[in-house]
Structure formats: C-alpha cells, structure tokens
C-alpha cells in the first residue's frame, strides 16, 4: 500500500489504532512535547492535536514514533522488511551488469523499479490551494512547537528543505531545524557537510552576493519524508528514490517564486531566499543528545510566500534524550543499513545502532571473522563507507555467535574476549558531530574501536577458551519433558 499524501496515511493509521485525535486544547508551548514524550516512551500512537491553544490549525506529532509506523509508511508491516529498501539502495550504489540471461531476469524487477524514478510534474497542486504573499506572510500564525523550557524560540522541525546547486542536475531534500526569528524569517541550521549547505556554497561561488532560492515543505507524504532521511546516492534526488519506494512517480509542482519543485500534496510550503550576507545566532535548543546545544551563526531564510492546502495540518516533532522520534526512526532505518554494509563487506552478519547511543554515536557489528586483524578492517570500513557513520564515536565488533542487539551478549564478549590495550583502537582528529560538546574542539574529536572477537594466532599467544554449549540432544529432550516437570516458566536458551 502506498500513500499519496499525509492525510491518507493519517486515515490508515487511525483505522489500525495507530493514531489518536486529541480534542482538548493543548498548548504548543511545552505541553505538546510533554504529552508526545510520555506517549512515545510507552510505545503509543501518533497524536493529532485538533484544537491547539490559540490556533485553528491541527498539529500532528509522533508520526514515526515506533519502528512499526515507519514500516507502515512504506507499505510494510514489519520493520525487518525495510531491509528490502536497503537491498535496493545497495543495488543503486553499486549496480552490476547482468552476467547472463538468468541473472538479467533476476535483476529485471529492480530495473523496472528504476523506471519509476523521475518525478511527475503537475500543474494544479493541493499544496497551492491557498496562497499568502507580501505583508500577509506571518510564520507566527503557525502552531510551531516550543519544545523545551530552555529553547530560545519556537522551532520548525519536520520541514523538508529543498535546494539545488548550480552544478547539480538533481534537487536535494534535507531536514534542518529552523528557528523562528520573525514573522517572515527563520534561521536555517544546516551543517557544512549537509546537502543544502553544499548547494548553497556552490551557488555563492558562482553567484556572489545574489539571493539563493530555498523552499521548505511541511506535511509531505510519508514516503517522501522518509526518502529525505535515507542515505540515497549523491547523484540521485530524494524525489526519485521516493518514486522507487512508492512504486509510482513522486508528484511535484513548480514553486510560485522560483524554479524549485515541491511535493504537490504537501500541507504547507514556505518559499523564499537566503541572502548570503544575512546571518543570525541560532540556539540554544534541546537536542537529540538530551542536552541543550551551544549557539552558533547560521544563514537566515526569508519567507516571501506561504502556500498551503485548505484546512492544512502542521507536522511537528521534538528532539530530546532518547527515546525520541529521531531515535525510533534510527531503529527502523537500522534495517536499511544492513544490506548496504553487507554489499561492501559480505562478512558482516548484523549491524546495530543502539537508540540510547543517540542513534548513530555507537555501533555494534557482528562478523564472520576470517583472519587476524579482521575486526579492525571492519571498523575502518564502517567509519569511511557511508557518511552517516563518520560521526559514530564507538564501534564494537563481535563474532557471529554473539547477538549484537543483545547487551548481555555484547558485554559478555567485551569482558571475556578483549584485552584493553591490545584490542582498543583510538583515532584522534576525526570529524565529530558539531553538537557533541564532549569533544575537545567543535566538530573534531576522537573515535574508539573495540575488538570483542575471539583472537586468532598472531593476535594472541594464549590458548583461547572454548565457549560452553549444551549438547543439543539434551536440550531437545528437556524441551520434550518440560511440561512434566511442574515448573511454571519455560525459558528458552
């Protein structure tokens, strides 16, 4: 099942008990965050606040608050099915020509999917049913959440920022938080390595001093939103990848004020520009780390037009100490990364980003070890292969007999298969998340790799221990007689 717009997905969630409508007047200032946080931590539904205090526009939160809802957005019921998305990405990142007729037939479905990539342009779009321009533009009229007591101002969180570089054929979609600065101004907090910032940098080099067109889409269809947070190849537009996931082309329309294309069924579109000479101090804000981050200077986005659907819905979220919505997205997208990594490193059995590690700061990888030093090779590969992992501070590598998603198993491997001096790899002066205040310099810090695998000859001079394993025949017999033993519980080991 695919969803053409956010509203059809809301209907689907509600029909399946995954969305709750709230008629009570809840304040976007702090109250929505507290309610959403409690519901998310209990594994509860998405929430639609139908009557936000002092506003008539409904607010949708916790849309992707469980891995199950992320899978549902892509027409799947089980998050493990998202590995199919990873397999598609692995194919796109490193396509191999067919080796013969049978191989060509096997790859035909993926080639057919590729035909759905180009977006479809439409002339009459729901997102442009209402047009607001000039002095009528007023961002303060939107029910923008003020998430935490120490936040400096309300914050736009789920906007898809659409940019295009002068050297790029594709448009880029990225999600960057935006501080409300005035009735027609937001601060665009994009870091230097992100797609939007790179497009802006290229534009400034070729067009010094000129205004840079930018569009932000709020409340797009769920597949396009998820495409914007998925590691698509640099040469591919997120619109194209959304078409692949959906099985039909993404509908877009031309913005009113510039040539950028926007998701046609979005709830709200903010159009405008960035003046390269206008910067503002952004923050502090509570972030996904569970702390307030430092302030810094970022470009100002001036909004010249607001277009929207009739009876538009404002899509929002909050970020805080895990679990939060980004952490739940990370748990689901974890399944996307597994096939991509396996394509490059077939020895990888599984890959896990613990949500309590802020989604990406720690990774645990299980491998089928084949030679001395193998664990270190996998560490280096994970840090360098996908830019999503260049901010991962800690990587733990374990053997295939260890469940990398089970902390009891992982801690057992660390404490029994590691020597701290021999098996710890420290690398200094590496890229680190700008929000990581634990690093000595902003954006630059160290990484640690832990080799918790069994050691091979050449890695140790000791006789290595053999794990204790019960005779499988005995286990089977005990399973058969368990109900006759009069023991209530039946643990499986």
Swiss-Prot record:
The record lists the catalysed reaction(s) as: a 4-hydroxy-3-(all-trans-polyprenyl)benzoate + H(+) = a 2-(all-trans-polyprenyl)phenol + CO2
Cofactor(s) this protein requires? prenylated FMN; Mn(2+)
Please indicate which superkingdom the organism of origin belongs to: Bacteria
Q: Where does Mn(2+) bind?
A: 172, 238
What are the positions of the active site? Answer: 287 (proton donor)
UniProt family annotation: Belongs to the UbiD family.
Q: What is this protein called?
A: 3-octaprenyl-4-hydroxybenzoate carboxy-lyase
The species this protein was found in: Shewanella denitrificans (strain OS217 / ATCC BAA-1090 / DSM 15013)
């Amino acid at each position: 099942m695919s969803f053409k717009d956010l509203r059809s997905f809301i209907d689907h969630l509600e029909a399946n008990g995954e969305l709750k409508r709230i008629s009570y007047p809840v304040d976007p200032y702090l109250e929505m965050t507290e309610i959403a946080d409690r519901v998310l931590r209990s594994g509860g539904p998405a929430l639609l606040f139908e009557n936000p205090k002092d506003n008539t526009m409904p607010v949708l939160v916790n849309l992707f608050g469980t891995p199950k809802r992320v899978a549902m957005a892509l027409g799947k019921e089980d998050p493990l099915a998202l590995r199919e998305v990873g397999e598609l990405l692995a194919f796109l990142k490193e396509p191999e020509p067919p080796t013969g007729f049978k191989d060509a037939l096997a790859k035909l479905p993926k080639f057919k999917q590729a035909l759905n990539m180009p977006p479809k342009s439409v002339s009459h779009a729901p997102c442009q049913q209402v047009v607001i321009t000039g002095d009528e533009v007023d961002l303060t009229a939107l029910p923008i959440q003020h998430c935490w007591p120490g936040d400096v101002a309300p914050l736009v969180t789920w906007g898809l920022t659409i940019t295009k570089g002068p050297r790029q054929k594709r448009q880029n979609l990225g999600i960057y938080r935006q501080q409300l600065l005035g009735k027609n101004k937001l601060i665009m907090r994009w870091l230097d390595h992100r797609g939007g910032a790179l497009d802006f940098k290229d534009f400034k080099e070729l067009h010094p001093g000129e205004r840079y067109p930018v569009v932000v889409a709020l409340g797009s269809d769920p597949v396009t939103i998820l495409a914007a947070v998925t590691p698509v190849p640099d040469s591919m537009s997120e619109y194209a990848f959304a078409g692949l996931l959906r099985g039909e082309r993404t509908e877009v329309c031309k913005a009113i004020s510039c040539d950028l294309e926007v998701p046609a069924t979005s709830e709200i579109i903010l159009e405008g520009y960035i003046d390269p000479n206008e910067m503002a101090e952004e923050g502090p804000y509570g972030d996904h780390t569970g702390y307030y981050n430092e302030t810094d200077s970022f470009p100002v986005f001036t909004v010249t037009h607001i277009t929207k659907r009739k009876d538009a819905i404002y899509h929002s979220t909050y970020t805080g100490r895990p679990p939060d919505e980004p952490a739940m997205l990370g748990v689901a997208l974890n399944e996307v990364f597994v096939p991509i990594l396996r394509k490059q490193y077939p020895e990888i059995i599984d890959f896990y980003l613990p949500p309590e590690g802020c989604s990406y700061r720690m990774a645990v990888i299980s491998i089928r070890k084949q030679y001395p030093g193998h664990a270190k090779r996998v560490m280096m590969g994970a840090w360098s292969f996908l830019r999503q992992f260049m901010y991962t501070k800690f990587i733990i590598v374990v053997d295939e007999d260890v469940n990398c998603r089970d902390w009891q198993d992982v801690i057992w491997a660390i404490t029994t298969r590691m020597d701290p001096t021999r098996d710890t790899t420290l690398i200094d002066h590496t890229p680190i998340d700008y929000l990581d205040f634990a690093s000595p310099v902003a954006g630059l810090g160290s990484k640690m790799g832990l080799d918790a695998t069994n050691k091979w000859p050449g890695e140790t001079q000791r006789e290595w221990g053999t794990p204790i394993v019960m005779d499988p025949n005995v286990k089977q017999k005990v399973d058969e007689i368990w109900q006759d033993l009069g023991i209530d519980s039946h643990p499986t080991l």
